[in-house]
Amino acid sequence: MSKLNIIFAGTPDFAAQHLQALLDSEHNVIAVYTQPDKPAGRGKKLQASPVKQLAEQHNIPVYQPKSLRKEDAQAELKALNADVMVVVAYGLILPEAVLNAPKYGCLNVHGSLLPRWRGAAPIQRSIWAGDQETGVTIMQMDIGLDTGDMLHKVTTPIAADETSASLYAKLAELAPPALLEVLNGLESQAFKAEKQDDALSNYAEKLSKEEAKLDWNLTACQLERNIRAFNPWPISFLTLEVDGVEQSVKVYQANVLPHQAKAAGTVLQADKNGIQIATQEGVLNITQLQPSGKKPMSVQDFLNGRADWFAVGKQL
């Protein structure tokens, strides 16, 4: 195995963990591409991405083009003369000129077992859909959306209480060693490229705040999965009327109970064991929630000052 000169492209913390693995390896990271700094926090100060922060700690040149479609940006990247470009949650579309610039092209770490869950939110959608397992795929990028040839897959089960946050953490542990295996075998072509079967593909649509609103006409099982899939963002919520004012309450944890005899959206019970709400099928038992302006709390703490919010028989 010879040392590879690598361009790394990524933006969030998930990507930074892969960059760290490359920095700890025998390979040479010659440049980092990441999204432009964005306003964050109350002061709306410009904040560097986790990938940029890590790169600067290691004195690696950082490039932050708004787009890679322009010829000057493409020429700048090509001039780096990299062996390979590694792309992890970068957030920009790579034109064909960029994909073909490095000697071995561009490799992508994708958070699903392709061709299942192509697109922006594979980790969240695997929980949302009730998948039993997921994993990461290292693929050779092409001009399609997550359609490139697959080089390596690593699988992991999805636990019954898995949230997107916990699954992100799990995949962030699994993926970097898998990436290094592929990089170490690039020269010898140790990993044979496997075409994706488009007939088995589906699309992992971005999450939206609107989708996070709990719809009592869904089943309790689906709502419970939504609560886990939408944690840490955008967090599921319900709305209810209190003294003529609509209140929004975020929901962090719930479980499913089988019995039900009332119309969907009816409060069946509210005590220290949970707030039970009838759904289209089954009962959603909410155990951790967050009123506006407060921290997440147990159902008992919530009901201590707000018992009337979820009166038995109330229709949400």
UniProtKB/Swiss-Prot annotation:
Q: Which PROSITE patterns would you find in this protein's record?
A: GART (PS00373)
Pfam family for this entry, one: Formyl_trans_N
Residues bound to (6S)-5,6,7,8-tetrahydrofolate are 112-115
Q: Where is the signal peptide?
A: none
The Gene Ontology terms for molecular function here are:
methionyl-tRNA formyltransferase activity
The answer to keyword Protein biosynthesis applying to this record is yes
| UniProt enzyme class | transferase
The UniProt entry's sequence similarity note says: Belongs to the Fmt family.
Cross-referenced NCBIfam families, in alphabetical order? fmt
Task: Output this protein's name.
Answer: Methionyl-tRNA formyltransferase
Annotated source species = Actinobacillus pleuropneumoniae serotype 5b (strain L20)
Organismal lineage: Bacteria, Pseudomonadati, Pseudomonadota, Gammaproteobacteria, Pasteurellales
Q: Which gene encodes it?
A: fmt
